[in-house]
């Protein structure tokens, strides 16, 4: 498909720079695709989720934890020092991270970069250099020691549409983590889950909604624009994820009982679809996924999708168009812009119904 079909104009004022407080005060647009008529759009709030979901529904959340993956440092250039910024995006080993560096044009394999924040310092060597500013960094520390050093040296990796307007501050350390954050490794938040509060979670459980956890370590590639003119020519970034055998069993039991699976976020949906077989059964999964979902995809594992509003021409907007229909999502986004919904990571959300039942092409 032509990528320009997924383009739209968004006023700069629609981009949220801070989250709603409390988190469940964010707005929620419920989108029900119409078969023979326009989509039904319902303006609600996140706190209405217990009313909108049914007893027996299974809500699948992503328990990844965002690490402080934005690093400031210097590299030697003759006798001078040149400033450099790194954004870690995928761990490749105990001391190895793939990262986007800028400026990176003059970097060479073997060079050393010294990252610092206050008195904290951390050195890394450029192991290999890739394309578009991507490098493989080998740090002087490994494993848990490296994780602790990153906590001291790194900054919260706010998305570029926020960081270009303001720097990260102390409030982002809490605001950009979800209630479910447990397993460190993400360099971007699974933003649909940012809306959950303990009170909302308790209300959902009291309603009879079952909560299951999966992991997908969201990479910085999630913000990369699609540069290709056709979706067939886009190379999707890989992210590491895991579905436990226990979670897979719970989802399959729910499916056999005719209960709905509700994905909290595109990350939860992508790892579930990666783990699902042709018959919709979910298997235990642990490894990389580079699943790229565009219109025409037949969803196998998910019945409803809770998700934020996404960037134009992004793989995530393509995914929601695949789920609920291209024209439906165009209509929904036009409504959201006109109604003053807040977009992107710190913004409001949609509860999407599918254009076709799962398993249907």
Curated annotation (Swiss-Prot):
Keyword Transferase belongs to the record: yes
Enzyme Commission number, as recorded: 2.4.99.17
Pfam families found in the cross-reference section: Queuosine_synth
GO terms assigned for molecular function: S-adenosylmethionine:tRNA ribosyltransferase-isomerase activity
Cellular compartments per GO CC: cytoplasm
A Gene Ontology biological process term: tRNA wobble guanine modification
Catalytic activity: 7-aminomethyl-7-carbaguanosine(34) in tRNA + S-adenosyl-L-methionine = epoxyqueuosine(34) in tRNA + adenine + L-methionine + 2 H(+)
Main localisation: cytoplasm
UniProt keyword terms in alphabetical order: Cytoplasm, Queuosine biosynthesis, S-adenosyl-L-methionine, Transferase
Cellular compartment(s): Cytoplasm
Pathway: tRNA modification; tRNA-queuosine biosynthesis
Source superkingdom: Bacteria
Enzyme kind, highest EC tier: transferase
Family, as annotated: Belongs to the QueA family.
Its biological purpose: Transfers and isomerizes the ribose moiety from AdoMet to the 7-aminomethyl group of 7-deazaguanine (preQ1-tRNA) to give epoxyqueuosine (oQ-tRNA).
Subunit structure: Monomer.
NCBIfam families named in the record: PRK00147.1, queA
Protein name, as recorded: S-adenosylmethionine:tRNA ribosyltransferase-isomerase
Organism encoding this protein: Methylocella silvestris (strain DSM 15510 / CIP 108128 / LMG 27833 / NCIMB 13906 / BL2)
């Amino acid at each position: 498909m032509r990528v320009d079909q997924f383009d739209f104009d968004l006023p700069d004022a629609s981009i949220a720079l801070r989250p709603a407080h409390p988190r469940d005060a964010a707005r929620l647009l419920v989108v029900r695709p119409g078969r023979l008529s326009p989509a039904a759009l319902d303006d609600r709030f996140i706190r209405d989720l217990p009313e909108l979901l049914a007893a027996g529904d299974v809500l699948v959340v992503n328990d990844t934890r965002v690490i402080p993956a934005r690093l400031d440092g210097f590299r030697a250039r003759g006798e001078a020092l040149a400033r450099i910024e790194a954004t870690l995006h995928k761990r490749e080993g105990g001391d190895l991270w793939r990262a986007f560096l800028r400026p990176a044009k003059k970097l060479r394999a073997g060079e050393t970069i010294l990252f610092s924040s206050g008195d904290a310092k951390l050195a890394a060597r450029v192991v290999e250099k890739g394309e578009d500013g991507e490098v493989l960094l080998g740090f002087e520390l490994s494993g848990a020691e490296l994780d602790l050093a990153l906590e001291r040296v790194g900054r919260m990796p706010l998305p570029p549409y926020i960081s270009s307007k303001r720097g990260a501050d102390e409030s982002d350390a809490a605001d950009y983590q979800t209630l479910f954050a447990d397993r460190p490794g993400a360099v971007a938040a699974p933003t649909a889950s940012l809306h959950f509060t303990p009170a909302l979670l308790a209300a959902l459980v009291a309603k009879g909604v079952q909560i299951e956890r999966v992991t997908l370590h969201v990479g910085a590639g999630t913000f990369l624009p699609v540069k290709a003119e056709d979706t067939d020519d886009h190379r999707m970034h890989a992210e590491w994820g895991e579905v436990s055998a226990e979670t897979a069993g719970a989802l399959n039991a729910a499916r056999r009982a005719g209960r709905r699976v509700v994905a909290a976020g595109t990350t939860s949906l992508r790892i579930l679809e990666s783990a699902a077989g042709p018959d919709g059964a979910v298997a235990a999964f642990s490894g990389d996924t580079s699943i790229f979902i565009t219109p025409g995809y037949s969803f196998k594992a998910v019945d409803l999708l809770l998700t934020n509003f996404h960037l134009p021409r992004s793989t995530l907007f393509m995914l929601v168009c695949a789920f609920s229909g291209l024209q439906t999502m165009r209509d929904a986004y036009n409504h959201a812009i006109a109604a003053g919904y807040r977009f992107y990571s710190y913004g409001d959300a949609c509860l999407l119904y599918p254009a076709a039942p799962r398993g249907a092409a």
